[in-house]
């Protein structure tokens, strides 16, 4: 496949960008109170639906003209053409000369997507079939550990996308998980993480999934070696490794040397970035937890949103609209962050998952031509589940000096039988979005009898923008839909900003430096340090604390 052709024009030089700059000056002080007063139908008109999700974007600081100009910007920047190039399997990851085919991971059986002359969908389903067969063996008890006991505990060992996605999905879908099994996740190279995950488990009932494409990732392989020693020491046999470890990797030689039968190695491809891989073999722990049928439902949800993004006009395209609104606040209002507020305790790790997805994708300072950008790119992503966050950081959103656009995610049907609590939870979603939009004026407070000296402190200015996303119920299908919503949201932003959303060279630099420093910390003899004076001093203090020579 040829590489996708992209316009070299800088986004800030487009007609739409210049029009948006002028438009911003015109409406920057317009209040949402006025926008709603002028248009009684705004709350139903500025909405969009697709793939089972309902997006209310009416509480954004936009007019019809704003949205028209944002869509014009997307078209001038070739968002639709770049989207289509991705779905065709073209190499839109230009720095690594790779296709970007996470959409192939959930393409229905029989679909054809050609990358480098090969139908990758057939390969995807071959791995899915392998995963399903293995998952069924573990779930049924057919797969037994070294001593003949069935597996009751599964520990996923990975880092970044090999960890955040599986952990987020397991917690989100725990109501669909096998209650007889325990699932845990180890990522941090801090030994406390491994100890916490294993302290109350029996090795003869525990299966480790080692997730590393190269089987060389420092954190993952350090934890893998620790896990191997734990199993071998507990079960007094090297042969136990083959029954208590499987791998998600492409390094058959490394997997075999570790002691894992390569028949129990689940592969994936270089056209899938780690942060886009939770629905690849990286999701093996998810499939074991919820079962192959529920995993298929999750993939169907991903595909539902893929098709919505691929076929829906930008004016009603959920991920495109959300991405363009992020551009609006990031580049015209100067907002530096986006808050992600899921009102579901099961979605507590969703903000952390989106941190990697968005910040690793769009945290870039050069454009596709290699030139330093003269415009802001990816915002900081953060958040907590509601209502927890209301009692910690919402105060700053309501009355602070920072503009923080927020996404509120609400589920209409509860998973818990405690429906009264769900009513309270949902009331808080709607109340927070309303309060942020409209605030409370001094006149309103005085009419309610607020003491004069207190009134200035109690005023909430409002005009804080939010999206509200309504989901029927937190099911495997809905989770897939929501993840794909944000994947394509990120894509839209990156295409507008003219950056490569699919590489991560900044991450690589830190890995290289860490490999250099490790032997300098470990050596018995005093190392010849050649870092800057700060790093040399820090290394020296560490060595001194551990009684090593300097």
Regions found by a protein language model. Name each.
Residues 2-37, 41-78, 320-332, 347, ...:
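Flexible, glycine-rich loop/tail regions that form catalytic "lids" or insertion modules at the edges
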Residues 153-155, 207, 246, 339:
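Conserved beta-strand elements of the Class I
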Residues 58, 376, 380-473:
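Helicase-primase coupling helices
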Residues 11-16, 23-24, 28-35, 41-147, ...:
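Extended, charge-enriched "interface" segments that sit outside catalytic cores
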Residues 164-179, 200-202, 224-232, 259-265:
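A glycine- and small-aliphatic-rich helix-loop capping segment at beta-alpha/alpha-beta transitions
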Residues 122-144, 169-171, 175-204:
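Glycine-rich oxoanion-binding loops at beta->alpha junctions
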Residues 461-464, 468-497, 502, 509, ...:
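C-terminal accessory domains/tails appended to large, multi-domain proteins
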Residues 223, 230-419, 439, 511-515, ...:
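Active-site phosphate/pyrophosphate-binding segments
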